């Protein structure tokens, strides 16, 4: 590898590291509700479900669909963390308000139901930079740990 290639690679790694830190901050800053003194962790667990779907190669492109497979991963994570289940329809729809996750399709939907989300939303997608970051296993693992630590998610 030439010195020029190395400098270019270092610039790329530095840029990706900056982008990773930016998105990690955004993910940890998702808006959550507090009900009866407890923070609802639906959005963080939904994000973890997406990470797991990428890991299992169920998501091969930046098109996140409301599927039974994704919902099963989401529900199993709720059980692993011992949290009270919040339906996936809420984070699937409302994560769009956090700036890095977007919906493509025919809406607005006032009160999302799984049926309406499947019919009206073609797919959800991340910012392209975030999607590229999530293709690297080490970044997914670091994000998972950060989410678990920040939102105090402990596997039971």
Set out the residue ranges of the language-model regions:
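Intrinsically disordered, charged low-complexity linkers and terminal tails
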Residues: 1-156
């Amino acid at each position: 590898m030439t010195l020029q290639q190395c400098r270019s690679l270092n610039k790329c790694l530095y840029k990706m590291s900056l982008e990773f830190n930016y998105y990690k901050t955004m993910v940890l800053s998702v808006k959550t509700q507090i009900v009866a003194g407890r923070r609802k962790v639906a959005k963080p667990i939904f994000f973890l479900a997406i990470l797991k779907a990428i890991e299992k190669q169920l998501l091969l492109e930046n098109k996140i669909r409301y599927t039974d497979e994704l919902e099963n991963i989401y529900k199993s994570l709720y059980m692993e963390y011992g949290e009270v289940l919040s339906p996936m329809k809420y984070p699937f729809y409302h994560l769009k308000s956090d700036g890095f996750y977007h919906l493509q399709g025919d809406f607005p939907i006032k009160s999302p139901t799984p049926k309406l989300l499947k019919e009206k939303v073609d797919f959800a997608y991340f910012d392209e930079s975030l999607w590229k970051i999530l293709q690297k296993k080490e970044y997914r693992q670091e994000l998972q740990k950060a989410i678990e630590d920040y939102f105090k998610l402990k596997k039971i």
